[in-house]
Amino acid sequence: MNIDAVVEFTKKHLKDEKTGHDFYHGQRVANLASKMYLEDHPDAHADSRMVAIIKSGGYLHDTIDEKVCDNPDKVIAEIKELLPEVGFTDLEVWDILFTIQHMSFSANIEHHYHLPLSGQYVQDADRLESLGAMGIARAFTYGGK
């Protein structure tokens, strides 16, 4: 499955992002999440539907973040139109949307959401991305805003 349209959508929506929640963060999350999935599932193929779901969630997860998006509902509606055009089924669209709407730390403070397997990989990759040198750089950038 080709997710180039998802990548371009993310580039468009995060092009002016300066807090560390930019396209390159989404790309790192997408790549790390899919790498972890493939390491856990050695029989899976890099071009599998599950990898496409995981990568799409990784790319899209900050496009609806209120820190960087003025109108998350509008972007969610755009994503709902985009994903079927790419070839995702209704269930796959639901998995991706549920993940990006419920994976953040703040979304889980009062209620812990159980993400689909694909979302668990995206959430883990996003949290790992917040650690180390990149996480420190992003914290200084966002904290200075």
Residue ranges: model-predicted function:
Residues 17-54, 66-67, 82-86:
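Alpha-helical phosphate/pyrophosphate-handling elements in metalloenzyme active cores
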Residues 47-67, 75, 97-106:
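His-Asp-centered metal-binding catalytic motifs of divalent-metal-dependent phosphohydrolases/nucleases
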Residues 1-11:
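Short alpha-helical hairpin
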Residues 20-23, 59-60, 124-127:
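Alpha-helical architecture
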Residues 89-145:
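Histidine/acidic-rich helix-loop-helix segments that form or flank divalent-metal centers
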Residues 72-82:
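Post-HEXXH active-site segment of zinc metalloproteases
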Residues 67-68, 132:
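Generic hydrophobic alpha-helical membrane-span motif
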